[in-house]
């Protein structure tokens, strides 16, 4: 296959995956946005975590909340647990890599806060540990995952939200995760700024 056609094929597959997932994910994304707004309105904060590309997504989300998305507004309390290399490496060295997010959640999380837990497979041990720590702190969880949802989907409690991308390709799941993050940011702004309803 010519390289040009291969590239165009990726664009087409990405667009089709997004269209195929839209109706299934929209209610979950709306539910997640309302959960975020409720927490923020009560003085809560959002902690976000993930590995690799999901770590980048966690940072992207936190930056959109702290700064702004597409509307002018005050900054919103959000923190990516993926950015402090001294903290991450000290926890990994002194305890275990699967504790790098959970120990931060235990230290920073408060009842009423929300954890945005991102894992393409749903099986990242450190993300699963973070969810357990969040539940122990009476926090709610928004799980952003794919495929069958893995162990992450199994950890969801009442009041949590699982946004599980119905795709098998890691690239397609990650692309839809980014779109989902943008949808969450837009929905939060719409709810806070009175654009919604």
Curated annotation (Swiss-Prot):
Any single GO BP term: D-glycero-D-manno-heptose 7-phosphate biosynthetic process
Pfam family name, one: SIS_2
Names of required cofactors: Zn(2+)
Keywords from the named record: Carbohydrate metabolism, Cytoplasm, Isomerase, Metal-binding, Zinc
Intracellular or extracellular location(s): Cytoplasm
Annotated InterPro entries: GmhA/DiaA, Phosphoheptose_Isoase, SIS_dom, SIS_dom_sf, SIS_GmhA/DiaA_subfam
Listed pathway(s): Carbohydrate biosynthesis; D-glycero-D-manno-heptose 7-phosphate biosynthesis; D-glycero-alpha-D-manno-heptose 7-phosphate and D-glycero-beta-D-manno-heptose 7-phosphate from sedoheptulose 7-phosphate: step 1/1
Binding site for Zn(2+): 60, 64, 174, 182
UniProt-listed PROSITE patterns: SIS
TM regions (residue ranges): none
GO molecular function, one term: D-sedoheptulose 7-phosphate isomerase activity
Top EC class of this enzyme: isomerase
Catalytic activity: 2 D-sedoheptulose 7-phosphate = D-glycero-alpha-D-manno-heptose 7-phosphate + D-glycero-beta-D-manno-heptose 7-phosphate
EC number(s) recorded for this UniProt protein: 5.3.1.28
SUPFAM superfamilies: SIS domain (SSF53697)
Cofactor binding description: Binds 1 zinc ion per subunit.
CC per GO annotation: cytoplasm
Domain SIS span(s) in chain numbering: 36-197
Function as written in the Swiss-Prot or TrEMBL entry: Catalyzes the isomerization of sedoheptulose 7-phosphate in D-glycero-D-manno-heptose 7-phosphate.
UniProt miscellaneous comment: The reaction produces a racemic mixture of D-glycero-alpha-D-manno-heptose 7-phosphate and D-glycero-beta-D-manno-heptose 7-phosphate.
Subunit annotation: Homotetramer.
Family stated for the protein in its record: Belongs to the SIS family. GmhA subfamily.
Protein name: Phosphoheptose isomerase
Provenance organism: Thiobacillus denitrificans (strain ATCC 25259 / T1)
Gene: gmhA
